[in-house]
Amino acid sequence: MDVKIAPDWKELLAPEFEKPYFADLTQFVRQEYATRRIYPRGSNIFRAFDKCPFDKLKVVIIGQDPYHGPGQANGLCFSVGDGVPFPPSLQNIFKEVADDTGTPPPATGNLDRWAEQRVLLLNAVLTVRAHEAASHAGRGWETFTDAVVRAISERKQGVVYMLWGSYAQKKGAIADPQRNFILKSVHPSPLSVYRGFFGCRHFSRANEYLRSIGKEPIVW
């Protein structure tokens, strides 16, 4: 199957694209885009991979599914397009970045700048119906993104995994803590942020680790 995804990821994930579940997933997603309003737009489904080459990967942040409001989802977990108001979880992420590193909140919630520094902003589910959270869950995306995490774990070491909330922690459990740096906290959602996300210092701790293995830190 010819999947429109960055060449290095395409080579890495080629076996997945030939499996029956992926054919079923593709058929479902195409039908959904043809008959409903789906986010993100089709060209952005694999944008997290297009923005972050596999060979230079430094950090993995795992989300659940795309934002389902108009103009929000842009293919990177937690990220929104330029000019779009910050969703609450993203506001809380920026507050922790500011408190942790001294970097003031940015003018835009577009996290392209993180992805371009080799942060993979990976949702577990890559598409969603407008105004219907988790509407594409259980259709095969989770199997695909599990394969992504597994491929990273098997082929790379020295990667920082930021696992926020039980869902991300379960998905990231395959990553070997002896070969990587695993950071866990509650989700930055307003429902849980005061139970350990604020004050987790994941951003400075990630940079300390990257420096310790000779890699450039991330400008958060």
Q: Where do the PLM segments sit?
A:
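A polyanion-binding, active-site-adjacent surface
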Residues: V3-A6, P15-L163, Y167-K170, A175, ...
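C-terminal substrate-binding/active-site "lid" region of AdoMet-derived donor-dependent transferases
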Residues: F197
